Each structure stands twice: as C-alpha cells, then as structure tokens.
Amino acid sequence: MDAIKKKMQAMKLEKDNAIDKADTCENQAKDANSRADKLNEEVRDLEKKFVQVEIDLVTAKEQLEKANTELEEKEKLLTATESEVATQNRKVQQIEEDLEKSEERSTTAQQKLLEATQSADENNRMCKVLENRSQQDEERMDQLTNQLKEARMLAEDADTKSDEVSRKLAFVEDELEVAEDRVRSGESKIMELEEELKVVGNSLKSLEVSEEKANQRVEEFKREMKTLSIKLKEAEQRAEHAEKQVKRLQKEVDRLEDRLFNEKEKYKAICDDLDQTFAELTGY
C-alpha cells in the first residue's frame, strides 16, 4: 500500500511537472507566435516602405527628366538669343560704316567748296589788277579789255562752277542732312539695341541662375537617389534578415509545438496511468 502511495505521489509529481512544462511550452509558443507576428508586421511595414521608396525613386527620376528637358529648352533659347545678338551687332557695324562714308563725302565736298572760293577770290584780285593797269596805261587798254573779258569769262566760268559747286554743296548738304538723320536714327537704333542687349544680358543672367539652380536640383536628385538606393539596400537587408529571423522563429515554434505535443502525450499517458491505478485501487 505504501508502495502504491509512493507511486501515486511520484506520478502526481510527474503530472505536476508535466503540467508546468506544458504551461511553459505554451507560454514559449505564445511568445514565439507574438514575436513572429511582430516580425511579420515589421516585414509588412518594410514592404510598404520599400514600395514608397520605389515610388519616390520614380518621382525623382521624372523630376530629373523634367529638369533636363527644361535645361535643353533654355539652352536652345540661349543659342537663339546669341544668334539675334550677333545679327544686331552686324547691323550696328553696317550703320557705323555708312556713317563713316557719309562723313568722308561731306569732307570732300567742303574741300571742293574751299577750292572754288579760293579760285573766285583769285579771279576778283586779277580783275582789280587789270582795272588798275587800264587807268595807268591806256595803250594797253585793249589788251587789258581783252584780258578783262577773258577774266570775266573766267569769272563767269568760275561763277558757273561756283553755282555748280553750290548745287553740289546743296546736294551734299541734303546728303549730309540725310546722313545726320541716319546717324540720329542709328543712334536711336543703337540705344534700342543697347536696351535689347541689357534685356538679353538680364535674360542670360537669369538663364545662368536657372541653369545653376537646375544643376543644384540635379545634384540634389542624385544625392537623393543615392540616399534612396542606400535606404532601399538597407530595407532589403532588413527584410532579408527579418525573413531569416521569421524562418528561425517558425522553426522554434514548430519545435516548441512538437515538444508541447510530446508533453501533452506524456501528460495523457500519466493521466491514463493514474486512471488505471485508481481503477485498480478501487477494484482492489
């Protein structure tokens, strides 16, 4: 009877130990399942972050392509502006050449007028000399008269030439006035061109600033893409690590479930032994 009691106590102790082990295994299984759920949640979060990173990367690429397109358009505009500036410079150079030619023609006309005036003065002086000589020497009157006629003819010729020179001078003055008008128009055009050049210069400065900003944005996009690539790589590594950890915990859960199943089987066997023992004692 004492042996049976000892056996029952031993079986009860073994039963209690089995129950404790089963509870421990269940708690460990719950903890493992909780950690597995937490890791699965982290994996889902990482997958969401990974998707967001891919979206951000696509957006960054689109913005980079847009910046490149804007930069190309600005470069085309800059080329067209430089071509327009070169055309305006050629026009200014042509106006300056026309002005120089007008000044040369004006100088030539003034020189011819001076020569004609000097010739007329010389003829008048000769006439005075001939008149004085006619008073002093009557014998030479005819000669002087002829000379006077010749002088008058020369004077008339000089007057004719003077009239022609005057007409030419008037024509030259008209040309000079036209040239001055062209000069004034050219100066006005030059002022307009200077204003246009200022506007073009400001546009060029604005384009340079825009290009610098575009380059800065490109560099920022590159740095951001590099950062996103690093984050993506880190996320992939974390996801891979999490998957490995999930697999390891799943194996641990499977092992604990197997252990729990074995403990339950042992507990069931002990209960069966106890029931059988009680049945034997009762039957005894």
Curated annotation (Swiss-Prot):
Listed GO MF terms: actin filament binding
Region: Disordered, residue numbers: 82-110
GO cellular component terms given for this protein: actin filament
Summary of the knockout phenotype: Pre-cellular embryos exhibit abnormal nuclear divisions with frequent loss of chromosome fragments. During cellularization, apico-basal polarity is also disrupted.
The record's note on its domains: The molecule is in a coiled coil structure that is formed by 2 polypeptide chains. The sequence exhibits a prominent seven-residues periodicity.
Family affiliation: Belongs to the tropomyosin family.
Name of the protein in question: Tropomyosin-2
Organism: Drosophila melanogaster (Fruit fly)
Higher taxonomy: Eukaryota, Metazoa, Ecdysozoa, Arthropoda, Hexapoda
